[in-house]
Amino acid sequence: MSNLTFFFDQLLSYSYLQQALTAAILVGIICGVIGCFIILRGMALMGDAISHAVLPGVVIAYMIGASFFIGAVITGVITALAIGYVSQNSRVKEDSAIGILFTAAFALGIVLITGMRGTGVDLWHILFGNVLAVSRTDLWVTLGIGLFVLLIIILFYRPLLLSTFDPVMAQATGIPVQMIHYLLMLLLSLVTVAALQTVGIVLVVAMLITPGATAYLLTNRLPVMLCLAAMFGVISAIAGIYFSVIYDVASGASIVLVASTLFALAFFFSPKQGVLTRYWRGKRAKEMSATS
C-alpha cells in the first residue's frame, strides 16, 4: 500500500482525522488572508506580539471556566492598545514596546500554565498545537471565527485597502485609520485563537506571515495576493497533515515546514522576484548583448 493510499484510507476511516484536516484548511485560509494585510502594513512583529500575548488570556479563561477565545481577544486587544500607549507616551519606539510587552505577556502565560501543573489540567498543547485532537466543538468555533473574519474583510475591504497603501489619503477621505488598525488587531486575535489547536501559539506567526509572504513574491495585486495566500495556506495544511500521519511527526510543525518550503520555492523561482530567475534573466541578457 502506497503512502498516499494509506493516508486516504486513514482519512476515510477516522472522523478525528477528517476534523483535523478541515480545521487545518480553515486555519490556512484565514491565516493566509489576514496575513496579507499584516505583511503589507509592515506589522509582522505586531502579528508575532499579538499571537504570543493572547496566552495569558487563554489560560485565565480556562481557569475561570470562560470561553478561551473571549480571553484571547481581550488580551490581544489590551496588548495592542498598551503597545500604542507606551510608544506614544514615552521615548520608547513601537518595536521596542512590542518586544517588551509581548514577551511580558507570554512569560505571564507560561507562569500561569506551570502554576496549574497540580490541577490535572494540561495546557501545553496551546503552545505547540495538536490538530489531531480537534473536537467537533473546536471545529465549529474555528468555522465561526473564519466566516466572521472573512465577512469583516469583505465588508471593510475598501477601508482596509486604502489605509494599508496610503493611510494619509485614507484619513483625508474620512476613513478612521486608527479604528481600522484596531479592527485588524481584533481580527488578528481571533485568527490566533482559531490557530491555537492547529499549530499552537509558538508557530501561529509562521502561518500568519509565510503564506502571505509567498503570495507577495508572486503578484502585485491585492485580490490575487489574498487568493494565493489562502491557497498556499490550504496546501500547507493538507500536505502538513499528510506528512504528520505518514511519518508520525508533529502536525503543527509539519504544516509550517510545508509553508516554509513553498516560500523558498517562490523566493528562488518566482517569475519576477525569484533570485535564481533574475540571475538567469540577467545572464541571458548579457549573452544576447555579447552576441549582438
Curated annotation (Swiss-Prot):
- For this entry, the protein name equals Manganese transport system membrane protein MntC
Q: Does the keyword Protein biosynthesis apply?
A: no
Q: Which domain of life is it from?
A: Bacteria
- By its UniProt entry, which InterPro entries does this protein fall under? ABC_BtuC-like, ABC_TroCD
Localisation: Cell membrane
Main localization, broad class: membrane
Please give the organism. Answer: Halalkalibacterium halodurans (strain ATCC BAA-125 / DSM 18197 / FERM 7344 / JCM 9153 / C-125)
Q: A single GO CC term, please?
A: ATP-binding cassette (ABC) transporter complex
* Record field: transmembrane: 20-40, 58-78, 96-116, 137-157, 168-188, 190-210, 226-246, 249-269
The yes or no answer to whether the keyword Cell membrane is present is yes
Q: Which UniProt keywords apply?
A: Cell membrane, Ion transport, Membrane, Transmembrane, Transmembrane helix, Transport
The membrane topology term of the UniProt record is: Multi-pass membrane protein
Q: What does this protein do?
A: This protein is probably a component of a manganese permease, a binding protein-dependent, ATP-driven transport system.
What gene name does this entry carry? mntC
CDD domains given in the database record: TM_ABC_iron-siderophores_like
Would you identify the family this protein belongs to, as annotated?
Belongs to the ABC-3 integral membrane protein family.
Return the Gene3D superfamilies for the record: ABC transporter involved in vitamin B12 uptake, BtuC (1.10.3470.10)
Q: Give GO terms for biological process.
A: monoatomic ion transport; response to zinc ion; transmembrane transport
